[in-house]
Amino acid sequence: MDAKQTRTGILLALAAYFIWGIAPAYFKLIQYVPASEILTHRVIWSFFFMMALISLSRQWHQVRKVVATPRKIAGLALSAVLVGGNWLLFIWAVNNHHMLEASLGYFINPLVNVVLGMVFLGERFRRMQWVAVLMATCGVLVQLWTFGSLPIIALGLAFSFAFYGLIRKKIAVDAQTGMLVETLWLLPVAAIWLFGIAVSPTSHLSQNPWSLNLLLMAAGVVTTIPLLCFTGAATRLRLSTLGFFQYIGPTLMFLLAVIFYGEAPGMDKMVTFGFIWTALIIFVLDALYIQRRVR
C-alpha cells in the first residue's frame, strides 16, 4: 500500500468521522421537527441520493447480484430494521438533550463489537481485551448500583449499531448497494408515516418554508457522504489503522454537548465515562502492542 493511498485513506477517514461527530449540530437545526419525521426524511432522501450515486458510478450490476440472492435480501431487511432503530434513537437523543449519552453509546460500541466477534464469529479475546470489556461493564454496573440508573440510550445505540455491523459483515455486501437496499426496505414505511400518518406543523412539505425543506432533504447527504468517505478509507487503510479513527466521532459529540449545548455531565455519567475511557485506553494500547509485534 503506497504512501499516497495511505494519505488519501487517512483524509477520507478523518472526513467520515468528523461529519459523524458534528452531525448532531445538523439535527439540532431541525429539532422542532418530530424525530419520527426526521427519520422518514433521512430514509427517503438517502434512498434517492444512493440511486443517483449508483447510477453515476454504474454499479447497478452489483445491485442485481444482491437482489438475486434471497439470503442477502433477508439479511439487509434485518439490518435495515436495526439501522432504522439506531437512527431514530440517535435523532431523539440529540434533540431531547441526551447528546452526552449518545456519545457514550459510540464510545461503548467498539467494545461491544469485540464481544459480538467472540460470540458469533469465534474470535478469541486477548487478555487485555478481557480487561477492557470488564472495565466497561463495571462502569455500567456502578452507575446502576450507585445511582440507580442505566444508560439505556447509550446501550441501545451501542448494541443496535454493533449488531448492524455484525449482520453487514456476515452478508458481505458493499456499502453503497447495502444502503440502497436497506433504505428501499424502509421506504414504504417512511412514506406511509410521512404522507399518511404524521400530523404536525412540519409534516406537510408544501406548507413548510423552502429553507426547512432543504434542511430535511439534506438528511440524505448527512447520511450518505460520511458513509462513502468511510468506504473509501476502508479500501485504502488497514482495518487496525482505521479503528483508531472511530473515537473522533463520539469525542466531537461529547465536546458539542458540553461546550455548545450546555449538557452538564452529572456524577453518574462521569463515573461511567471514566470507566469507559479507561477501558478504551487499554483497548487501544493492546491493539498498538499487537500491531507492533506483527511488524
Residue ranges of model-derived segments:
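Membrane-interface interhelical linkers
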Residues: 1-15, 48-76, 127, 179, ...
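C-terminal-most transmembrane helix of multi-pass membrane proteins
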Residues: 2, 247-295
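Hydrophobic transmembrane alpha-helices of multi-pass small-molecule transport proteins
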Residues: 128-144, 157, 268-287
